[in-house]
Design a protein with these regions (language model features):
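Bulky hydrophobic segments
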Residues: 1-435
């Protein structure tokens, strides 16, 4: 007879939650210290400097960085409460809420203090305040939404049904938040006037959107439409519940969504507003609704996807588009000597290049790379490959693309893209196998 030990009955999800929380906290610390240029400093001197860190007067150009620091800590507060305060009443969760608040504040102070040893990081009271505000906001959100979040995690681990609904809900929340990131809203009439006089908006296309080739502009518009497809699926499911055609009002609601977002983005300093986005969102909304209406045919497509002709054709078109958006056809190519110089200047540290740009550009870069390699996960799903094979296929593809940038003028390889692309392909393949 087997002897049962208390440890045998422990929920394995607890360990997964802890390591997931720990991974995000580690990411916050790592991202706050990149480029990891450690410079020794006596502790007493560091402490004396830290006690005198200033409260800076931030203009609108630096407001996005300040807000982004706070946004980075929202998940810290949220996850600390949502994953570890499993009791439902506020009173019984109060000790965890207090502990989470103290932990987040201590983390913010410790990270800012550590940045003294890692120039050129900037240390200021502004950052500490932003990180504490973000932590509190995350904790407040967890008080009201932690139950939904735990149910979402349960669906991903196979403990509950309705995985598709939960994923779509999470995507909708993320889509709206992403649309207004980094939340540097205009706060005065002078700032609004500056936005009106800028090239960050246009009745159809903004001047900022047309500074690259026509193919890149078309690819960006296509990505905008593609990003709304899951919202079209949500609309179609809602229509079906009400016994209406799946595509009912899809174009109208897509255009209205585009209008609301573009008007909202007009009062975000870092955002770009353009009329073409109404059209792309209308197309994306209708496309998502149509996909849901034709889901049986798509299931048949998956059933017959072992046909190599289909997947090879799709894969060839994908590789053509991938190489095009990565500058193969509109940039000059050079030889081995140029590649050797570029390689010598390349930094292999993950997310090194994200530090030397704004938070909005860094997030857009991450999202665009994820979108570029998500088709690898779809193709792997069609071919019934394992998620691990999807991961390595995307890693190999991204490595080839990044290596090619050694030979292309005005571009530089970023090893982070290999990690981002491979992880995205794995996640897409894993999710499609579960739906």
């Amino acid at each position: 007879r087997a002897i049962s030990h208390p440890a045998d009955d422990r929920d394995p999800g607890v360990d997964r939650h802890f390591f997931g929380w720990l991974a995000y906290v580690a990411f916050v610390v790592y991202g706050s210290l990149v480029p990891l240029d450690f410079q020794p400093l006596p502790l007493d001197q560091a402490w004396a400097t830290f006690k005198q860190i200033p409260m800076l007067q931030l203009g609108i150009e630096r407001r996005a960085d300040w807000v982004s620091n706070g946004v980075l800590y929202v998940p810290v507060g949220f996850l600390t409460v949502a994953l570890f305060a499993e009791r439902r009443t506020l009173l019984t969760r109060l000790p965890v809420v207090v502990g989470a608040t103290l932990f987040c504040f201590a983390l913010a102070v410790a990270v800012e203090f550590a940045q003294l040893y890692f120039p050129p990081r900037t240390v200021s009271l502004n950052d500490v305040v932003a990180e504490c505000v973000g932590s509190v906001l995350g904790i407040v959100l967890a008080v009201y939404w932690s139950e939904w979040f735990r149910e979402m995690l349960a669906t991903l681990t196979g403990k509950l049904g309705q995985l598709g609904s939960r994923v779509l809900q999470a995507y909708a929340i993320g889509y709206v938040a992403f649309s207004f990131f980094p939340f540097d809203f205009l706060l005065s009439t002078a700032e609004l006037a500056a936005k009106v006089d800028s090239d960050a908006w246009g009745w159809f296309l903004s001047a900022q959107s047309t500074d690259r080739s026509a193919f890149i502009v078309a690819a960006k518009l296509f990505a905008e439409a593609l990003a709304v497809v899951p919202l079209g699926i949500i609309l179609a499911r809602w229509n079906v519940v009400r016994r209406l055609p799946a595509t009912r009002h899809a174009v109208l609601y897509g255009a209205l969504l585009g209008l609301l977002i573009e008007v909202g983005q007009f009062v975000v300093f870092s955002a770009v507003s353009q009329g073409a986005s109404l059209l792309t969102r209308a197309i994306g909304m209708y496309g998502g609704a149509r996909l849901w209406a034709d889901r049986k045919q798509l299931a048949e497509l998956h059933a017959h996807a072992h046909n190599k002709v289909l997947t090879v054709s799709l894969g060839s078109l994908y590789l053509l588009a991938l190489t095009a958006v990565n500058g193969w056809f509109d940039h000059r190519w050079h030889g081995m000597a140029f590649a050797a110089r570029t390689l010598a200047e390349t930094r292999l540290l993950p997310f090194y290049y994200h530090y030397y740009t704004s938070e909005q550009v860094a997030l857009l870069s991450l999202a665009s790379v994820a979108l570029m390699y998500s088709p690898v996960g779809v193709l792997a799903w069609l071919r019934r490959w394992s998620p691990a094979l999807a991961f390595w296929s995307a890693a190999l593809t991204a490595s080839a693309v990044e290596t090619s940038k050694l030979f292309i003028a005005d571009l530089h390889p970023d090893p982070s893209n290999v990690l981002i692309g491979a992880s995205t392909a794995w996640a897409v393949s894993k999710l499609l196998r579960r739906l």
